[in-house]
Curated annotation (Swiss-Prot):
Domain of life: Bacteria
GO molecular function list: rRNA binding; structural constituent of ribosome
Protein name, UniProt field: Small ribosomal subunit protein uS11
Cited SUPFAM superfamilies: Translational machinery components
Cross-referenced Gene3D superfamilies: Ribosomal protein S11
InterPro entries noted in UniProt: Ribosomal_uS11, Ribosomal_uS11_bac-type, Ribosomal_uS11_CS, Ribosomal_uS11_sf
Purpose: Located on the platform of the 30S subunit, it bridges several disparate RNA helices of the 16S rRNA. Forms part of the Shine-Dalgarno cleft in the 70S ribosome.
Record gene name: rpsK
Pfam family, one: Ribosomal_S11
Subunit structure: Part of the 30S ribosomal subunit. Interacts with proteins S7 and S18. Binds to IF-3.
DNA repair is among the record's keywords: no
A single GO BP: translation
NCBIfam families: PRK05309.1, uS11_bact
Length: 130
């Protein structure tokens, strides 16, 4: 069988971005960390699933820590030093993801909770009976 041709697409140029925003979306099933510049352009991202966790383990605090470390490492390579942290969602990986960003060497200037709260909007799903 013939070998598939290797694609050599445009490589992303390393930019020097000193300030940015870390968006942490933490649900009960997964944690997604996106690090953007101040205008909102994504510089690096990672999730518990992308870090190698599957199934129920994606919702654990350790998976969130691993995802945050991976995203922070890539952001540090782009020259990022200071970040604001916006946390969204009720998941268990919120605090550990913030701590992992700090331990990785990023200076956190602000932590803001941006979890959306309905002003009595849509009807809630019925309660689970387990």
């Amino acid at each position: 069988m013939a070998k598939p041709a290797k694609k050599t697409g445009p490589k992303k140029a390393k930019r020097n971005v000193p300030n940015g925003v870390a968006h942490i979306q933490s649900t009960f099933n997964n944690t997604i960390v996106s690090i953007t510049d101040t205008s909102g352009e994504v510089i690096s991202w990672s999730s518990a699933g992308a870090s190698g966790f599957k199934g129920a383990r994606k919702g654990t605090p350790f998976a969130a820590q691993t995802a945050a470390e991976a995203a922070a490492r890539r952001a540090l390579d782009q020259g990022m030093r200071q970040i604001e942290v916006l946390v969204k969602g009720p998941g268990s990986g919120r605090e550990t993801a913030i701590r992992a960003l700090q331990v990785a060497g990023l200076e956190i200037t602000l932590i803001r909770d941006v979890t959306p709260l309905p002003h009595n909007g849509c009807r809630r799903p019925k309660r689970r009976r387990v």
